[in-house]
Amino acid sequence: MTSTSQFKQLERLGNGTYATVYKGLNKTTGLYVALKEVKLDSEEGTPSTAIREISLMKELKHENIVRLYDVIHTENKLTLVFEFMDNDLKKFMDSRLDREMPRGLELSLVKYFQWQLLQGVAFCHENRILHRDLKPQNLLINNKGQLKLGDFGLARAFGIPVNTFSSEVVTLWYRAPDVLMGSRTYCTSIDIWSCGCILAEMIMGKALFPGTNDDEQLKLIFETMGTPTEQTWVGVSQLPKYNPQIPLYPNKDIKQLLQATTKEQISDVLVNLIQGLLQLNPSMRLSAQQALSHPLFEEYH
């Protein structure tokens, strides 16, 4: 039975939704770990979010998913022992911004990170798990350049029916239009939309759709991707928060948009993948497995 005395607590790394994260040292092995401490309310017991994260994470063993080694349950706190990662994608991108203009990562690195992101997502989806909160802050990177999915605080194994999910998922900028319009029957496609937003952000060095509220978020999406109609997305007008007053924006040239933010040449193959991930109609979005088979990743096949 592991106890917290096996670990030496080092500096605090951050505060999550319901936990504080510390860097720790395993005194037995000499390896660094991340210690996620969840304070327990004596009345309430263990938060259900933490229980959900634990049961999911212990099953998920994949090189692109942060490994949960152990769970230590004491009277007033729960300590989750994760593998230690040096950085996250958000901090990594921020540290490399060209001060002249917002510029993203080199395209070879973008491709390598996106491949790893999709590998992790595909593994989740094969195991009937939605991540539901993919964003650069939740993609952890070590000094070997490995990228891994972390923070499954909102993840939930999905089954049938799937129309009971709460709409409180995914940070606004990475939130799919179907979720923003109140769809309650979403599935793996919500993670795919987030993957598309992250891919664009790695190239551009800034968020593709940086909205401040649901309405503005949808407006930004439609201004770029075009306003959906019943012709392009059957059932869109039946969604609870569909607004028939929204202007009919034409779709913009994504290639031009991306090219304006980088000195490297944006290929049609890359644009094609982004368009496949950022389909407004969730049923038209690529699956993670289809995205991994995309010609952009030919060298990895």
Curated annotation (Swiss-Prot):
Residues reported in the UniProt entry to bind ATP: 13-21, 36
GO MF terms listed in the record are: ATP binding; cyclin-dependent protein serine/threonine kinase activity; protein serine kinase activity
| Name of a matching Pfam family | Pkinase
Q: Which SMART domains match?
A: S_TKc
EC top class, in one word?
transferase
- Per the record, what is one GO cellular component? Pho85-Pho80 CDK-cyclin complex
Q: Which GO terms describe its biological process?
A: DNA damage response; G1/S transition of mitotic cell cycle; lipid homeostasis; negative regulation of calcium-mediated signaling; negative regulation of glycogen biosynthetic process; negative regulation of macroautophagy; negative regulation of phosphate metabolic process; negative regulation of transcription by RNA polymerase II
What is this enzyme's catalytic activity, as reactions?
Answer: L-seryl-[protein] + ATP = O-phospho-L-seryl-[protein] + ADP + H(+); L-threonyl-[protein] + ATP = O-phospho-L-threonyl-[protein] + ADP + H(+)
Instruction: State the source organism's domain of life.
Output: Eukaryota
Q: Does the keyword Magnesium apply?
A: no
Sorted UniProt keywords: ATP-binding, Kinase, Nucleotide-binding, Serine/threonine-protein kinase, Transferase
Per UniProt, residues of the Protein kinase domain are 7-297
Q: What is its EC number?
A: 2.7.11.22
Q: Which SUPFAM superfamilies match?
A: Protein kinase-like (PK-like)
Please give the positions of the paired cysteines in each disulfide bond: none
Catalytic residues in the record: 133
Q: What does this protein do?
A: When phosphate concentrations are high it phosphorylates the PHO4 transcription factor thus establishing repression.
Q: How does it assemble?
A: Interacts with a number of cyclins.
Family per record: Belongs to the protein kinase superfamily. CMGC Ser/Thr protein kinase family. CDC2/CDKX subfamily.
Official protein name in the record: Negative regulator of the PHO system
- Give the encoding gene's name: PHO85
